Every structure is written in structure tokens, then in C-alpha cells.
Curated annotation (Swiss-Prot):
Species assigned in the record: Drosophila melanogaster (Fruit fly)
Catalytic activity from the UniProt record: D-sedoheptulose 7-phosphate + D-glyceraldehyde 3-phosphate = D-erythrose 4-phosphate + beta-D-fructose 6-phosphate
CDD domains assigned to the protein according to its UniProt record, in alphabetical order: Transaldolase_TalAB (cd00957)
Major subcellular location class: cytoplasm
Disulfide bonds listed in the record: none
Domain of life, source organism: Eukaryota
Segments forming a coiled coil: none
Alphabetical GO biological process terms: carbohydrate metabolic process; pentose-phosphate shunt, non-oxidative branch
GO cellular component, as recorded: cytosol; nucleus
Complex formation: Homodimer.
Protein name: Probable transaldolase
Enzyme active site: K142 (schiff-base intermediate with substrate)
Amino acid sequence: MGSDRTLKKQKMSVLQELKKITTIVADTGDFEAINIYKPTDATTNPSLILSASSMERYQPLVQKAVEYAKGKKGSVSEQVAEAMDYLCVLFGTEILKVVPGRVSTEIDARLSFDTKKSVEKALKLIALYKSLGVDKERILIKLASTWEGIKAAEILENEHGVHCNLTLLFSFAQAVACAEAGVTLISPFVGRILDWYVANTDTKKFEALKDPGVISVTNIYNYYKKFGYKTLVMGASFRNVGEIKALAGCDLLTISPALLKELENETESVVTYLSVSNAKLQDIEKITVDESRFRWLLNEDAMATDKLSEGIRKFAVDTVKLENLIKTYLK
């Protein structure tokens, strides 16, 4: 009996098994939670920064950002903008103290249709990181996968050596455009695709391997590896651990602390579903997308159109909430 207990103790958790074949990323701004699960990288977004900024233990960071902004001349709205940028960078800097890899910092969602301003904002964030002693190699600038966002990423990568993470990615057309732009990494969403199919079709439950979000990421991964694109695929937005396990082998998976905990508590063998060798065997046609084709294909995809616009709106709403929170400190 004692030996059975010893065996159970020695058996690796699903999270440990996954770490052998996939880079695990923590999807949170709560860097104390990140420290528990020892991921390689971390991702943040406006909603996660808002959530963390509302926690008592992170008030000193908010105060620090506000003090920084007060030292800048300008109107209240300009000071709020300064505080917002600095706060995102402060969170990123703290996160980098507990992860060995990179952190993703997101561009204001309200710039999703402005290439020039997205580039300017990204370079400002990179400069702020540099002022705090953080090298740009440890930063991924997150941009929405609009045509304008993808073009901004292309400029940042090619002209400034800034690595980009293209988020709110729901369609194959978006993925192809990102690969052709040569971005460092994409974050195709899984759970939000599932949400759309549950809400808009008669099927309310999907097995993990038949989950439309899992299928979407699998198709993108296979396409990238088949044709030798350097862009990495980081599955994101998970609703359950089944989706995560069905994407074992993906370049990276970014996972919330709640689901990381579930994976840590499970012990079972992990099957590698995604691999370069298997992708090379797939019968896939190579396509190319210019702006008009990108817009047409996106428009033809009701799910992707809905979810991209909804995602941008949600991040914009949470950005405004964070601005309002900062305003209370500036008064």
C-alpha cells in the first residue's frame, strides 16, 4: 500500500507533462499567482491589468504609476495616458522578475484600426521598459489581429526589431496574414470560438478534439509548420482543461491560473496531438492574402467578425474603466 502512495506521489502532473512538449504561459497580471506555477512566459491584456489593479496588494504599483504621471506636464487626460502606459510596463517588469522568458503587453484597443499610432504606442512602451532596465527581447507587444494591427506588427518587427504577439485571432485569414507579415507569435483564441458556436448553433457540448476552437488552432498550427513559417502559435482563451490537453504539442499555450491549478492537480498521460512531423504530412493548399482578400475572408466568417469586434470593444471598455480608476488617484 505504501509503495502505491509513493508511485502516486512520483507521477507527474498533467501540467508537468505538458511543459515537456509545450511552452506554458500564464495568462494573468497577478504576478503572485504566476510564481506558483512556474510558467516560462506571461501574457497580460487590459482586462487582466484592470483586475490586478483592483487588488489591494497591487495598489503600490498603481500609486507609482500615478506619481510618475503627475511628474509629467499636461492635461488630466494626458496624465491618465502616461499613467496607463507606465502601469502596464510596471506590471510587465514585475512579472519578468518571476518568469524566465517574455511578457506580452497590449496596445490600447482603441488604436486597433490605426497602424501609425499603434507603432508609436508600441515604441513608447518599449522605451519605458528600457528606462526600467528591461531589454526589448523580453517583451512581446500585443496587437489586435486587424489588418491595421498586422501591418503595425510588420513595421515593428522589420524596422524596429520589436517582437509582436497578434491577439484576438479567430480566423484562418488572420493567421495567414500574420505569417506573411513575419510576426513573432500569434494568439488564436479557443474558448471564445467555442462560446460562439454554443450560442449560435444547436450543438451545446463538444468533445475536446471536436471543439471548434481546438480545430481552428490545429489547422493554423499545421499550416504554419507545413510551409515552414517562423511565427509561433500560442493557443489562448481556454474554457476547460480538455481544450488545453487537445492542443498538447502546440508551440505555446497561455493559461489562466485557475486552469493551471486544475492541470497541476491532474495526473494522466498527455498525448501529443500537434507536431511538426505530422503537420508536414497534411494535404494543405498554400494561400496568400492581400488587404482586400483579408477583409473579404474575415467578412465571410461570421464567428470571426463577431468575436474580433466584440473583443476589441471589451478591451476598450476595460481600458476606460482602468482610466477612470487612475483618474480617482489623480484628483
